[in-house]
Amino acid sequence: MAVETLRGGRDGGIASGVNDTSPVALPLPDPADVARRKKIMGVVFLTLFLDLLGFGVILPVQPFYAESFGASATVVTLIGASYSLMQFICAPLWGRLSDRVGRRPVILVSIAFACVGWLILGFAQALWMFVASRLIAGFGNANLGTVQAVVADVTAPKDRAKGMGMVGAAFGLGFLFGPIIGGVFGSRYGAHVPALIAAGLAALNWFAAYFLLPESHPAEKRTAAVVVDGHGPRRSIFPLQALKEALAMPSVAPLLVMGLVFGVGFSLMEAALSLFVERQFVLPPAFGTDAGHKEAAYLSMLVLVTVGVAAVIVQGGLIRPLRARFGERSLLLAGAILVAVGFAGTAALPFLSLPFAAMLALNVVVAAGSGVFSPSSSSLLSRSVPDDRQGAILGVGQSVASLARIIGPSMAGALLELHRSIPFALGAALLLVAAVLTRKVRDPEHV
């Protein structure tokens, strides 16, 4: 494999103490290696797209599916928190395991679990089956950190934000087309049908990954399962210990704290969105009926599609030039402020009697803010650790995001029952706190 840069330390610079200033010819990239990296990125995009397409399919109908089993708004959002609880527990496990055995087997096993979870959801006959399906799917879908580690494996640090932007674009496309499929089939044939479609997409995803995805993390770079040569700390796969280890790293801790605050605020919106739409825009006598649920699912689909379009535009095409011009720290600040503005506007809707189009416009602002914040945060996080810890640290990052999605939804339902604006108002306040915390973040290239 050709060497693209001269390496003299973690930052890739030439070792200090070398006084020879004569020009040095850098080896040209190996065309075969470049082609391999592009292939891996393409397969990762396909895998993520199918994964998020399946997840997006269920989004418009999931709250109303749970309500059909007698769940209240508080229970609906707690079920969402249980899904994130499994991701919090399992994301470091998947990430650390991928550092030890490779990315490919971890991705294949996790997709298989997700498929089983979606199947149980599709055939659920009681609320306990609904909850069990979300726990199993959460266990399987805790693999985002591993997928991000694949991106980190095959991209140079200077291109990391672009690679993470591709991850975001796959998210956007999944959230664009998934809710359309879920909204159409759910409104016609019932809420269980989108779950079965999600199971089929997970099965297709498994076969695509099995036949197309090569290993990106070679054996010589893998972390041993035991302490190397009897020295150094043992790296835990358990979330609290792994999080403790990550928080001890000065370059990582500010990113994780900021990400937690951002995630709690954002997840308040995610958990409350469909129920807010139902209470704000579905009027009596349809409200609370099957027809009202279908109308709310359709309107929620429109919001999610709008978010998906905006996310694809920002993360698929704008993130690289924005990073080059403003830098990732500036994008973190701008992203948090944009999301806060969108949330504050949404919280004001019940008091302003604005039409549904205002809800769509505000979510474009939210998607734009999240679209620059998330890939910038992931890029900074991945560049803050050595190559052999990419999977572990990105798994911890996903675990922190999952912890946020436990805290936020656990409050969202109860807050929404007090008043539908409260989750969005609190979310806006937390996003402003996250904006302030961006001042503590340091770019590894400039430390």
Question: What are the functions of these language-model segments?
Answer:
Residues 133-172:
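Cytoplasmic helix-loop-helix junction between adjacent transmembrane helices
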Residues 70, 102, 123-128, 349-353:
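Helix-breaking motifs and short loop linkers at transmembrane-helix boundaries and internal kinks
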Residues 23-37, 216-256:
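Juxtamembrane intracellular "pre-TM" segments in multi-pass secondary transporters
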Residues 88-125:
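Conserved MFS/SLC helix-loop-helix module at the cytosolic interface between two early adjacent transmembrane helices
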Residues 167-211:
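Helix-loop-helix hairpin linking two adjacent transmembrane segments in secondary transporters
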Residues 330-377:
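C-terminal transmembrane helical hairpin of 12-TM major facilitator-type secondary transporters
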Residues 105-120, 199, 330-345:
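Structural signature of the two symmetry-related core transmembrane helices
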